[in-house]
Amino acid sequence: DKWQMPQGGVEPNEPLLMAMKRELEEETSIKNVKVLKEFDQWLEYELPENLIGKIWKGKYRGQKQKWFIVKFTGEESEININTKQAEFIEWKWIDMNLLPNLIVAFKKNIYEDILIELKKYVN
C-alpha cells in the first residue's frame, strides 16, 4: 500500500490558495489550517509508461503541482476522510522523513522536494 498527502485540481479562475483549502476540506474535512508557505516553484512528474492511458481516463501523462505547507490548527476530531467522494481509506500522522518512501515511486522526487521545504518549517 502507498500513501499520499491530500491534493487536487484547480477550478477555472480559482486562486491557488482557495483551491488548496477547498481540496483539503473535500478530502479530509479539515478547515483549520495556517498557511506557512506556498512553494515558489511548480513540481512536476510523468506517469510511468505502464500507467499512461490506464488512469485519469487516459487524458493525462503526468501532473504539474503547486504545493503549500500548512499547519493544522484544529482538533483531530474534525478530520474525516469518509467524505462524499472519499479518496482515502486511512489517515495517520507520520515522521516527515518517511514521506518519500511511502509514496508511489513515480512521485518520490516530488516528495523529496517537499521534504526539503517542510524541514524549514518544522522543528
Labelled PLM ranges:
Residues 1-5, 17:
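N-terminal strand-loop-strand
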Residues 10-105:
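Unchanged
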Residues 96-123:
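Charged phosphate-binding loop/patch that engages nucleotide di/tri-phosphates or the phosphate backbone
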